[in-house]
């Protein structure tokens, strides 16, 4: 089917005429609507009746939560609608004109503001056009970046759930002039945040009475409920702190002779202090509550500090001066008997006699036998030499009851010959033999004192090992209890771990 050129031109002219007529109707309608319109006048048919305004919002994004300054920054589109009695027209008289738009300031609109605004301008909305249809229904959708004051409860940080309120209401109209009604918030266009999960945004309408006026002042409060995502803080704060606190237990496994026990404890304590400062930088300077992670750091620092104190005691035991005195009886009973039995620890050389003692006995016996074989028939000089070496043979090892180590203290069982040796006088014609016997006595006493000192040192060293093992077990239990008890006390700990670490 072919269309003639005349028909095409006729259709084009008709469309242009329709457009020009529609533009003329819009111009005429604008003139009629604003002819006697006063933007200061509340647009109601009866001034005694309140104007109903429906209010809602659309949350697009949680931009920032400043815990230190306690400010919530959100991207929100406000939604306000009402009926303007003076902005109505008959569609048949203005064909094609179903809606008109009025810029800010030309028509009346409610002065609804965010009560708890923290913005420098207070009103952070961008004033857009008001959309009006033929029935007088007005729709106002101003977007804005809202900064609102929000009380940040850091009690369960980093497993916390925050509830930030957005309170909206008319700044100058009371309830008898403007009836503010709430509609549900829209989160269909919400953009997820990397730090916070949006739980919900319930709303509530309330009325408040002031002493100045009898009329109520309605307001609409939306509560932005959000849960902190703990993956970041878990990987950068919690897990390193747990590992550092576990390193503190290695202080009790490090040998006392290494000289690094105190250094390791102090290093761990300084590391925890650094993490504590990192947490303090992002937390508000408030004394209302102590963050959960700060409680964990504080308890861990106390445990590490106590471990350093115990390490000092262990080193004092390990390097105890043998001339400083014996171990007290109650210390020996508690540490060397009860605690050692509980920890299944055995003293060094408990199951067998020290080889050094056996060697000394064998050496003394051999010397006695040899000298007895070489000695001449009983005479004054020979008898003295014979008696002297038998006296040395009488010095044998006997463990004493108060010794911490078996065969650690040398106890002498003097024989009759030794009494003769000590009490007898050397003959006048043998000064060399007298000197030899004096030197032998000196050497024997020196060995006896050395064994006593070694016994005392071994006793204190074993006590230090017992304290190390006991503190290792005790501090391990305390660390596990603090880690599980403090961190799992958060109400949403299981939910946070299952969602963020899964």
Curated annotation (Swiss-Prot):
* SUPFAM superfamilies named among the record's database cross-references: Neurotransmitter-gated ion-channel transmembrane pore (SSF90112), Nicotinic receptor ligand binding domain-like (SSF63712)
Intervals, Extracellular compartment: 23-233
Q: Which gene encodes it?
A: CHRNA7
- Which Pfam families does the UniProt entry name for this protein? Neur_chan_LBD (PF02931), Neur_chan_memb (PF02932)
Write out the function statement from the record: Component of neuronal acetylcholine receptors (nAChRs) that function as pentameric, ligand-gated cation channels with high calcium permeability among other activities. nAChRs are excitatory neurotrasnmitter receptors formed by a collection of nAChR subunits known to mediate synaptic transmission in the nervous system and the neuromuscular junction. Each nAchR subunit confers differential attributes to channel properties, including activation, deactivation and desensitization kinetics, pH sensitivity, cation permeability, and binding to allosteric modulators.
Which keywords has UniProt assigned to this entry?
Cell membrane, Disulfide bond, Glycoprotein, Ion channel, Ion transport, Ligand-gated ion channel, Membrane, Postsynaptic cell membrane, Receptor, Signal, Synapse, Transmembrane, Transmembrane helix, Transport
Residue positions the entry lists as glycosylated: 46, 90, 133
How far does the signal peptide extend, from start to end residue? 1-22
Q: Which residues cross the membrane?
A: 234-254, 259-279, 292-315, 467-489
Q: Name one GO biological process term.
A: positive regulation of MAPK cascade
Highest taxon listed in the record's lineage? Eukaryota
- Protein name stated in the entry: Neuronal acetylcholine receptor subunit alpha-7
Q: What regulates this protein's activity?
A: Activated by a myriad of ligands such as acetylcholine, cytisine, nicotine, choline and epibatidine. Oligomeric amyloid-beta protein 42 activates specifially CHRNA7:CHRNB2 nAchRs. Activity is modulated by positive allosteric modulators (PAMs), such as flavonoids, with a wide range of chemical diversity, pharmacological sensitivity and efficacy. AChR activity is inhibited by the antagonists alpha-conotoxons RgIA, ImI and ImII, small disulfide-constrained peptides from cone snails. Alpha-conotoxin PnIC selectively inhibits CHRNA7:CHRNB2 over CHRNA7 homopentamer.
Q: What is the effect of changing residue 120 to A?
A: Decreases permeability to Ca(2+). No effect on permeability to K(+)
Q: Which family does it belong to?
A: Belongs to the ligand-gated ion channel (TC 1.A.9) family. Acetylcholine receptor (TC 1.A.9.1) subfamily. Alpha-7/CHRNA7 sub-subfamily.
Tissue range of expression? Expressed in neuronal cells. Expressed in macrophages (at protein level).
Q: Name one GO molecular function term.
A: amyloid-beta binding
